[in-house]
């Protein structure tokens, strides 16, 4: 039974998130339903990350064991013909039988988008956080520099985050765009805590609005207290852009876990 790795793109507005839940449609549920129709049997799908309600993806990764052997094109084109228009398979490849989309990950890249023009945008309302005030891009870049590296990000985790610890590594955090139009925070890290990127975005916007100096972000990080950071940015601005992989499962220290196994992003 071959194991297939799917790369997915979806517009998450009408979904309760990745994971199957009783209160509405999820990305996982519509994907598993489409696969059942395509393959004639029920399959279970695992993902690289559990995106929240309203969050989008251009590079989510999922995998499943296929009860039938089909050409790769059939998995892509056939499944896309069965999925709703806001979910699509971009690519399908066969992988090792022990491939795990979360555990084998060596990192992810997210983009958080903010519309900072003074008037609302009908075209951005489902894909950006609209703040209606020009943001200081340079100040936010200075603030973002304090977040690079490996730190305890307790100040940026959700209250109900289940991760055993809050130590994570941010490899890069770029602030792109233009004051008075649209700005993006592009963050790449080994793993993420629940709501971590949205909390980082909310904190950087506080600096961009001039409410706090760039140095305040370093103080928030050192405090390890969620109440010291900015608000949680809304979900519609967040996109999971890419999941990065190694050639095989990551090495583990005796009795320890890898960053990927602790990932809640």
From Swiss-Prot:
Signal peptide: none annotated. Substrate binds at residue 110. Its EC number is 5.4.99.12. SUPFAM superfamilies: Pseudouridine synthase (SSF55120). Residues 244-265 are annotated as: Disordered. CDD domains: PseudoU_synth_EcTruA (cd02570). Keywords: Isomerase, tRNA processing. InterPro entries: PsdUridine_synth_cat_dom_sf (IPR020103), PsdUridine_synth_TruA (IPR001406), PsdUridine_synth_TruA_a/b_dom (IPR020097), PsdUridine_synth_TruA_C (IPR020095), TruA/RsuA/RluB/E/F_N (IPR020094). The active site is at residue 52. Pfam families: PseudoU_synth_1. GO terms for molecular function: RNA binding; tRNA pseudouridine(38-40) synthase activity. It comes from the Bacteria. The keyword Isomerase applies. It catalyses: uridine(38/39/40) in tRNA = pseudouridine(38/39/40) in tRNA. One of its GO terms (biological process) is tRNA pseudouridine synthesis. The keyword Methyltransferase does not apply. Belongs to the tRNA pseudouridine synthase TruA family. Homodimer. HAMAP family: TruA (MF_00171). Formation of pseudouridine at positions 38, 39 and 40 in the anticodon stem and loop of transfer RNAs. This is tRNA pseudouridine synthase A. It comes from Myxococcus xanthus. The gene is truA.
């Amino acid at each position: 039974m071959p194991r297939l790795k799917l790369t997915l793109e979806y517009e998450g507005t009408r979904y309760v998130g990745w994971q199957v839940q009783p209160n509405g449609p999820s990305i996982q549920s519509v994907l598993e339903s489409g696969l059942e129709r395509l393959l004639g049997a029920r399959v279970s799908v695992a993902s690289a990350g559990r995106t929240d309600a309203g969050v989008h993806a251009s590079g989510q990764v999922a995998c499943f064991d296929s009860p039938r052997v089909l050409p790769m094109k059939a998995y892509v084109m056939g499944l896309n013909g069965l999925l709703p228009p806001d979910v699509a398979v971009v690519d399908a490849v066969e992988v090792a039988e022990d491939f795990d989309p979360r555990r084998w990950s060596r990192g992810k890249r997210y983009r958080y988008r903010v519309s900072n023009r003074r008037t609302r945008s009908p075209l951005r309302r489902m894909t950006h956080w609209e703040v209606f005030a020009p943001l200081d891009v340079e100040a936010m870049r200075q603030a973002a520099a304090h977040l690079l590296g490996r730190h305890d990000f307790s100040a940026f985790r959700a209250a109900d985050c289940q991760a055993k610890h809050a130590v994570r590594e941010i490899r890069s955090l770029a602030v792109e765009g233009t004051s008075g139009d649209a700005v993006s925070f592009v963050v790449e890290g080994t793993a993420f805590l629940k709501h971590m990127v949205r909390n980082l975005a909310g904190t950087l916007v506080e600096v961009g609005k001039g409410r706090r100096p760039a140095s305040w972000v370093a103080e928030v990080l050192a405090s390890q207290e969620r109440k010291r950071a900015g608000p949680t940015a809304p979900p519609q601005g967040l996109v999971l852009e890419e999941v990065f992989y190694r050639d095989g499962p990551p090495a583990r220290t005796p009795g320890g876990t890898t960053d990927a196994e602790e990932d809640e992003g």
